[in-house]
C-alpha cells in the first residue's frame, strides 16, 4: 500500500506557487471556511469563478495530467488497471492557518456515495512548512509540506491520512482528484 504513495518534487516552480497564493488571498470573496469535527481550513474552488481562474485551470490540469501519466509509468500500472475514461474534480486551493486550530484530522477521501467515484488524490504544496505535513498514521509514513512538490495516492480506506497543524506560517495546497465516469 505504501508503494502507491508517491511524491514528486519540483512539480511547480516557486514563482507559480507564490502566484497562486497571492491570487487566493486577493479573492477573499471566493473563500469558503470549514470547521467541523477536526476539519478546519479555508478553501477556494476555482470552478466557482472559472472566468477568473481560466488560465490556472487549463495550466494546472495539464500539469496534473502529466503527473498522472508519470505515476502510471513509475508504478508500472497497465492500461487494464485504470479506467479508459475519467474526469477531474474541480481544482481547489486550501489554506491552513498556524493558529493551533486549522488541521485535517485522520480521514479518507472516499467515504460516501458522493465521493465514491474518486480514485486518485493530487496535492501540490504551495508553501514550505516545517509542520503541516500529510501523515499516513496506519502506514507510519508522511509527506513533507515542501513548496512545489506533488503528493499522489489512492483516496480509499487503506490510505487513512491527516493534514497536521502548521506551526509558524500558513500552509497552502492545491488539490484535485481523478474520478471514474
Predicted features and spans:
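Fe(II)/2-oxoglutarate oxygenase catalytic core
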Residues: 1-150, 158-181
Amino acid at each position: 500500500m505504501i508503494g502507491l504513495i508517491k511524491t514528486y518534487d519540483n512539480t511547480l516552480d516557486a514563482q507559480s506557487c507564490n502566484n497562486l497564493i497571492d491570487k487566493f488571498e486577493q479573492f477573499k470573496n471566493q473563500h469558503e471556511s470549514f470547521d467541523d469535527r477536526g476539519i478546519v481550513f479555508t478553501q477556494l474552488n476555482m470552478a466557482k469563478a472559472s472566468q477568473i481562474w481560466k488560465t490556472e485551470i487549463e495550466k494546472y490540469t495539464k500539469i496534473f495530467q502529466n503527473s498522472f501519466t508519470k505515476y502510471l509509468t513509475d508504478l508500472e500500472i497497465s492500461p487494464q488497471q485504470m479506467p479508459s475514461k475519467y474526469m477531474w474534480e474541480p481544482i481547489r486551493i486550501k489554506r491552513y492557518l498556524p493558529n493551533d486550530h486549522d488541521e485535517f484530522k485522520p480521514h479518507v477521501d472516499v467515504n460516501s456515495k458522493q465521493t465514491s467515484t474518486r480514485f486518485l488524490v493530487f496535492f501540490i504544496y504551495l508553501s514550505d512548512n516545517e509542520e503541516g505535513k500529510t501523515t499516513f498514521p496506519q502506514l507510519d509514513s508522511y509527506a513533507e509540506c515542501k513548496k512545489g512538490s506533488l503528493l499522489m495516492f489512492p483516496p480509499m480506506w487503506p490510505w487513512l491520512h491527516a493534514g497536521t497543524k502548521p506551526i509558524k506560517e500558513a500552509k497552502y495546497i492545491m488539490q484535485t482528484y481523478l474520478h471514474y465516469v
